[in-house]
Structures are given as structure tokens and as C-alpha cells.
Amino acid sequence: MSDKINLMNLTRQQMRAFFQELGEKPFRADQLVKWIYHFGEDNFDHMTNINKKLREKLKTVAEIKAPEIAVEQRSADGTIKWAMQVGDQQVETVYIPETDRATLCVSSQVGCALACTFCSTAQQGFNRNLTVSEIIGQVWRASKIIGNFGVTGVRPITNVVMMGMGEPLLNVANVVPAMEIMLDDFAYGLSKRRVTLSTSGVVPALDKLSEMIDVALAISLHAPNDELRNEIVPINKKYNIKMLMESVNRYLNVSNANHGKVTIEYVMLDHINDGTEHAHQLAEVLKNTPCKINLIPWNPFPDAPYAKSSNTRIDRFQKTLMEYGFTVILRKTRGDDIDAACGQLAGDVIDRTKRTAQKKRFGKEIGTHQIY
């Protein structure tokens, strides 16, 4: 393992401090960040506005290292899924091009501890948190492949969603700095409305998030009552729907990124959570929370105990919610032919603990609020 500092682990402010420690002017950090993220450069020799002496010094103490591509799969609909190598394991990153945008779905952990029953990632177990460089490096690597680095007015990626493998709010220490780089005008310069963090509801971390960063928020709700959510989203046993929605409203009260509305994500599981009675219950849960609702057709994975809701049931569910005045969008399934659709990401995870032991550890950490 290299003892050089990976500059992708540093925000621009941290990099300014790094250059000061080297006896250099802090503005060198601004130059370097622009080279790395705006131009996609990882070779110090190519950074022509930095003097040769400093470039040689940097080569002895620092490196610029992003995850490498292990496997690439391309869908018939244009979606691309990459398995990215992080140490001896792999996480998955998905690029979703559309007419007016290009979205990158980024992973935050190797595996996931939350054990949501309808999600393929959760079945892999949990290994570790990704570092800042492994998170922002997914964006860098994808941008490098897609191209258009440094082309004025052209962005290879217009939106980033923290909706890949893992629970972002259980890795705040690395997710937040990575998102800061996404927002930094010297790096990717994305609008805070174009960077979305999706969470299953780690309430203490969500309450602290607004003190650290302002980005768009999506809530993986998936059930309209505690009894059902306890079964399919087990973190609900610790932080129930009432606690979660109160935390969401607190975040919305101080956030500018969300236009006053949160996105509610709701996977459609046949005869599990897709009945008309569930729609009425969901409307009651959300009546005091400004939101838009994304209905997500469930995407199958091996040995899963669920079936996808029929179009008839989805349509009835959607119309019931719309009668209450909610904005309800049916998410178009993308990349399902390469297992890149929502809930299908798996990667290559070495589960460090058996699932029951992991759940006990997870519950202890959450109980003491040691969340990052």
C-alpha cells in the first residue's frame, strides 16, 4: 500500500492546508482541484501551470488515484453499469443518460448493513465504508469514460444521486466531503439541487446533515405503516415513520436545495405494499410533509421473495395518491437487462461478519449514535 496521500481524499479546503504544510501558497490547491476534476487529469507532469519543482515534489508525497473499472456492462437503453475495484472488492456505479440530463448513481459503502428485504445489495452483507476518494473517484472515473472533460458548457454528468450500494448516512464522514467536491466550482460545480442523498432513515445523522451540507434529499420509505416497514426496512424498528418524517421536516425547514419538497421513494411490491388501503395510509403519513412521490417498479434478483406489482395495481395506487393532490411519478426502469436497475446492485462484497452479528453491531452503533 502506498504511503503517499491520495489527493482525491481531500476537499479543496483540506488541500489548501496540505499545500501550506508543504510551504506552498494555498492557491495551488485551487489549480490542482481544477486539473483533477475539471480536466480529469491524474498526471502531475501534465499540469502545466504548476512549476516543475513543485510537480516533482508532489510526485514524492502525493498521488491522484480513483477506483479502476473491473467490469463494464452496457444496456440496450443506453444505461452503463461499472463494477469498480475498491481494494480487493467491487462496488457498482450506474450511468443513466437521458435527453436532458445524465445521472450517475454512486455507491457509498461496500455492501450494506440495513438488510432491506427487497434490495439485492442488502443480501450481500456489509464490509466497510468507502473513502472519499472511492466515492468521488466513481464520478471522476465515469466522467473520464463518458468524456467531454474541460469542454465549455458540456457536462458528462449533470446529476449525482447517492443511491448506489450502501446507506450514505452511515458513512457521513466520507460522503459529505465527497459531495462538497461535487458542489465545488473548482471541481464539478454541480448545483446542490443536482446532488441527491437517499437515505432509509438514520434519523440522528439526518438531523446533523443540515449542519454540514445542503443537498437534495430522498427518503426510501417503501411502506405506509410501521408494522410493514419494520419487516421490509428493518431500521424502522429503531427510527419509526413518525420520527423519520419529523426529521425530514426539520431538514426541509433549513434546506434551500429541495425547493421545500422532499422526494419519497416507494418500491412497488405485488400484494405487499401496493394496495389501495396502502395508498390511503401513505397519504395520511405524508399529509404534513411537502413532497413528490416516486413509485419504483420492483426489480427482481435471485431468490427474492417478491414479485413486481402489476401495471393495474401501480396505476390504481398512483391515481389514489393523486386524488389527494400529491405529485406522483412512476420511475422508468433503466438498465434492468444488466442488473443495473434500482435495488439490483450487488458488487463483490466480502461480508466481514455473519448477518446476525452485523445486525447486532449495527443496532449498538445506532443506539449510541455512533454513526460516522
Curated annotation (Swiss-Prot):
Swiss-Prot/TrEMBL keywords: 4Fe-4S, Cytoplasm, Disulfide bond, Iron, Iron-sulfur, Metal-binding, Methyltransferase, rRNA processing, S-adenosyl-L-methionine, Transferase, tRNA processing
Keyword rRNA-binding: no
The gene coding this protein: rlmN
Sequence similarity: Belongs to the radical SAM superfamily. RlmN family.
Pfam family, one: Radical_SAM
Domain (Radical SAM core) ranges: 98-337
Active-site residues from the entry: 92 (proton acceptor), 342 (s-methylcysteine intermediate)
Cofactors named for this entry: [4Fe-4S] cluster
GO biological process: rRNA base methylation; tRNA methylation
Transmembrane segments: none
Disulphides: 105-342
Highest classification ranks of the organism: Bacteria, Pseudomonadati, Pseudomonadota, Gammaproteobacteria, Pasteurellales
GO cellular component: cytoplasm
GO molecular function: 4 iron, 4 sulfur cluster binding; metal ion binding; rRNA (adenine(2503)-C2-)-methyltransferase activity; rRNA binding; tRNA (adenine(37)-C2)-methyltransferase activity; tRNA binding
Signal peptide: none
Catalytic reaction list: adenosine(2503) in 23S rRNA + 2 reduced [2Fe-2S]-[ferredoxin] + 2 S-adenosyl-L-methionine = 2-methyladenosine(2503) in 23S rRNA + 5'-deoxyadenosine + L-methionine + 2 oxidized [2Fe-2S]-[ferredoxin] + S-adenosyl-L-homocysteine; adenosine(37) in tRNA + 2 reduced [2Fe-2S]-[ferredoxin] + 2 S-adenosyl-L-methionine = 2-methyladenosine(37) in tRNA + 5'-deoxyadenosine + L-methionine + 2 oxidized [2Fe-2S]-[ferredoxin] + S-adenosyl-L-homocysteine
Protein name listed in UniProt: Dual-specificity RNA methyltransferase RlmN
Binding site residues for [4Fe-4S] cluster: 112, 116, 119
Co-factor: note: Binds 1 [4Fe-4S] cluster. The cluster is coordinated with 3 cysteines and an exchangeable S-adenosyl-L-methionine.
